[in-house]
Amino acid sequence: MPSSAAATLFALFLMLLPAEKVTILAGDLKEPFAIDWDKAGNAYIAEMGGNRISLLDKAGKQSVLAGTGEKGLSGDGGAAAKAQFNGPHHLLVGPDGDLYVADTFNNCVRKIDLKSGVVTRVAGTGKKAYSGDGGPAVSADFGGIYCIAFDPKGEKLVMCDLDSRRIRAMSLKTGIVETVAGNGQKGMPKNGEDAKTQPLVDPRAVAVDSKGTIYILERAGHALRAVDAAGKIHTVAGTGKGGLSGDGGPALQAQMNGPKHLSCDKEDNVLIADTETHTIRRYSPKDGKITRVAGTGKKGSGGVGGAPDQVELDRPHGATIDPSGAIVISDSENHRVLRIEK
């Protein structure tokens, strides 16, 4: 075969290959809900169903970092490996290099010193209630902390207090907690109003972009809200009715169904784990549109090795960006973590 013909065939072959493909980053997990990385490239995974935190080191070795696997609240002040957790939904490596864990059903946030391995409680008494604004977060009560975020300056820990229907923030310097969104009542907030005076449906997840905009994802509200630097709240995505529609168009005309997690990329786009539609979607604040990133919309486990729009997911509870800029998905009910490679 002439070299020119061979080159043409090879070029056609490359065109048929997916520009992106989905690979398995980690498996053998019990309902992974969240993942984050330290500066060295080690990954930490919150296993909601396993009541533990797993470590995936940069060499690819997987081990248990924290949690005995039994539900409970114990071990503060001691080794994280001997501590008990209860349904941890989220985690993040903080600006101080320590690992912060939303210990959801223990109604608190705990911190693991990654150098010493010691775990301590930084927010929440463990009691499910609402109290403590204006005082130390460690003495305050929360109604299930489902998600956490840090502000761009690394000064505040922002917490999603779902059953209290509030977003609360703790100063990392003073430890004092305050409400930044939600008045405790159930309902849809009015656009342009002070976020602290408005109701929320059920704030399930929170993220903060590089400008300090606080994004709130509502599970049963099927919507994404944004709190700007002035403290005003607006709905930016979702009709409020559950469904799967609107990809490629205005986000306010799109439907989501029980979304559970969100994160912001370097361009301040918002990734959304649209859990009950088994998809990952992206909201762009620049043009107000929403697009599908991964998932067919069908519950399943097929399609690994292929294009993101052909992979089947099963109730994903996490969507985030790894240090290289790749999208990583917590494919929870398939008990695995996926990575979209270019």
Model-identified regions with their sequence ranges:
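Bacterial N-terminal signal peptides
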Residues: 7-15
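Gly/Pro-rich loop segments of beta-rich domains
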Residues: 20-31, 44, 61-87, 117-144, ...
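Residue-level detector of Asp-centered blade-edge/turn motifs that repeat once per structural unit
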Residues: 37-40, 93-96, 150-154, 208-211, ...
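Conserved beta-propeller blade signature
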Residues: 42-44, 98-100, 156-158, 213-215, ...
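Short loop/turn segments immediately following the C-termini of beta-strands
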Residues: 48, 104, 162, 172, ...
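A short loop-to-beta-strand structural motif that recurs across blades of beta-propeller domains
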Residues: 51-54, 107-111, 118, 165-169, ...
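Blade-level signature of beta-propeller repeat domains, shared across WD40, Kelch, NHL, RCC1
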Residues: 315-342
